[in-house]
């Protein structure tokens, strides 16, 4: 039997909600998953016992996502709807399109506080970029899948073989576990998947992109920067480019992640808060731990840093360069490229300077290449780890160029391209697909981290920078400003709750204060109120009849001064007007 069939997860089930238990029955299966609603004991038992003979299914589900404890009770999470994405190496890939949150024992205990937690839980599950497959391990690259199969052949089940860094419902799946439950546990990957059947030179092949976001140090743009004490970095993302052709598979992996030392850039109502190093932290230790893990996972690392060489970003760049030098690890090479300076005035052709610098190592690293029968041709021996300040816009541009160069080499080796032919010149149709997919990848990764689509995607989609693209970037930048200052605190709480970083205390709202309770000082209400009144009075004064010019002028000067004073106060105490995470607040306030 195909090992993927042995590890497959049930894809079509009936859910029965009985007074004492949840019963999940796979259609066509010979076993049941029984979850006690009172004792929370989980077991898998034969379907022949007649347990559901007299029951009517409550609903049909397409996946068991896990269970989570909130204030009033535990909740069962199930997938109810899915969207077809494509077929990858013979296995169907889906996107989560609907879910249900079902209480074990409904009650009204701490109802208000519990509803707040349910709202946070839904906010993460409502993300439209969760992907899954019942037979294909989306969490592992092709190369890791082979390594896992060889090093742990006795392990069965998609979740058990999965790369836990990329299992977004790993915490809620681990909350209930029992023997023989593997076929009921459906891992979710957050990121982006695109599967395309394409043709070049009359040869048909599948070209796919899989992007996986890490659960380690997961969060939002300005609340999650740099590294933690274990060397886990913010916005760490692995992207794999897969080619399937004529019984052969190739995979090319790249990574991105925040600069691996302790720094932050907390919102304060300024358009661009200054990023700063966190004082008193061991930056070298964090950087060393990070690259030790990256080398273990990927082999040699080329750290491609695209931040500015001047200003606040320049200070971070100098720190990163110094730390890599002090590490003295021959398996890590640092490559710095001031993206904005080099490509100013829309000279994006200068990116080829960077690609040329990386070409030798890219040829050395190679790609993973294997035949369907398991015959190994080559492995990828190193990785490009790219970053800019956000690891979004500039990073995606460079990654797409490295992916294109790798794809040219792969297709030449497979015989799809002629010797010396480049993929960007081989087919206008494929080039349009390639650019569109990488631009979509940029947008989705950016939406998950910053809340808006990526910047600079006009270059990725068209191959050149345009004025309309620059205008769209301006709109997205303004939207990022609003979300990062006034919405991302709750989004960060939602992520921390779903990933199990925060565990709900049953006494919250009673003996223990609820962390979700709003706490604001007097300035939070006073300055905006004064500003609102001052603006209103200023506008009213402007409508007065012209014969009262002197009096009008005095009124306008007074209310104009009040506008200036209140606006200055808001900016000066900007951190007090930001929506901060409440489960793990990065700072605290003390009103005088």
UniProtKB/Swiss-Prot annotation:
Side Cytoplasmic, residues: 1-523, 574-592
This protein's UniProt keywords: Endoplasmic reticulum, Golgi apparatus, Hydrolase, Membrane, Transmembrane, Transmembrane helix
GO cellular component, one term: endomembrane system
Family annotation (Pfam families): Syja_N
GO biological process, one term: negative regulation of smoothened signaling pathway
Key word Ribosomal protein present: no
Protein name: Phosphatidylinositol-3-phosphatase SAC1
């Amino acid at each position: 039997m195909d090992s993927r069939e042995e590890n497959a997860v049930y894809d079509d089930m009936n859910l029965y909600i009985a007074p004492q238990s949840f019963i999940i029955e796979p259609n066509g299966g010979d076993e049941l998953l029984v979850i006690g609603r009172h004792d929370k004991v989980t077991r898998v038992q034969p379907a022949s016992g007649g347990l559901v003979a007299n029951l009517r299914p409550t609903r049909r589900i397409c996946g068991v996502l896990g269970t989570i404890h909130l204030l009033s009770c535990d909740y069962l999470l199930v997938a109810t709807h899915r969207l077809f994405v494509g077929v990858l190496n013979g296995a169907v890939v889906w996107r989560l399109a609907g879910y249900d949150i079902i209480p074990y024992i409904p009650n009204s205990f701490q109802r208000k506080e519990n509803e707040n937690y349910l709202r946070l839980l839904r906010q993460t599950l409502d993300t439209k970029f969760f992907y899954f497959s019942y037979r294909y391990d989306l969490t592992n690259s092709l190369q890791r899948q082979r390594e896992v199969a060889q090093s742990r052949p006795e392990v069965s089940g998609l979740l058990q073989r999965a790369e836990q860094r990329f299992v977004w419902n790993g915490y809620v799946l681990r909350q209930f576990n029992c023997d023989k439950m593997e076929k009921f546990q459906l891992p979710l990957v957050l990121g982006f998947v695109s599967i395309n059947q394409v043709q070049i030179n009359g040869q048909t092949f599948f070209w796919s992109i899989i992007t996986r976001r890490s659960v380690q140090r997961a969060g939002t743009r300005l609340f999650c920067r740099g590294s933690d004490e274990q060397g886990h970095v913010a916005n760490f993302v692995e992207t794999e480019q897969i080619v399937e052709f004529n019984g052969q598979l190739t995979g090319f992996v790249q990574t991105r992640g925040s600069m691996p030392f302790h720094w932050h850039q907390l919102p304060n109502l300024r358009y661009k808060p200054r990023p700063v190093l966190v004082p008193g932290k061991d930056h070298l230790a964090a950087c060393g731990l990070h690259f030790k893990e990256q080398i273990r996972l990927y082999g040699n690392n080329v750290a491609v840093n695209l931040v500015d060489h001047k200003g606040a970003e320049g200070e971070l760049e100098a720190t990163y360069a110094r730390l890599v030098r002090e590490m003295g690890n021959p398996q890590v090479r640092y490559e710095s490229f001031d993206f904005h300076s080099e490509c100013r005035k829309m000279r994006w052709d200068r990116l080829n300077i960077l690609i040329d610098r990386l070409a030798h190592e890219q040829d050395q690293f190679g790609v993973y290449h294997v035949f369907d029968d398991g015959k190994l041709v080559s492995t990828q021996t190193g990785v490009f780890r790219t970053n800019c300040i956000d690891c979004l816009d500039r990073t995606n541009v460079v990654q797409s160029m490295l992916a294109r160069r790798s794809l040219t080499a792969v297709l030449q080796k497979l015989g799809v391209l002629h010797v010396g032919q480049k993929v960007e010149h081989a087919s206008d149709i494929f080039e349009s697909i390639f650019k569109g997919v990488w631009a979509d990848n940029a947008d989705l990764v950016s939406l998950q981290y910053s809340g808006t689509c990526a910047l600079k995607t006009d270059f990725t989609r068209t191959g050149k920078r345009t004025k309309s693209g620059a205008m769209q970037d301006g709109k997205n930048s303004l939207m990022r400003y609003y979300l990062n200052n006034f919405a991302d605190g709750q989004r960060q709480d939602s992520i921390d709750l779903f990933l199990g970083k925060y565990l709900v205390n049953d006494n919250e709202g009673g003996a223990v204060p609820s962390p979700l309770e709003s706490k604001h000082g007097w300035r939070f209400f006073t300055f905006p109120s004064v500003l609102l009144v001052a603006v209103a009075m200023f506008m009213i004064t402007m409508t007065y009849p012209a014969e009262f010019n002197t009096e009008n002028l005095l009124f306008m000067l007074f209310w104009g001064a009040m506008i200036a004073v209140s606006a200055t106060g808001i900016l000066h105490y900007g951190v007090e007007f930001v929506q901060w995470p409440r489960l793990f607040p990065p700072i605290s306030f003390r009103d005088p």
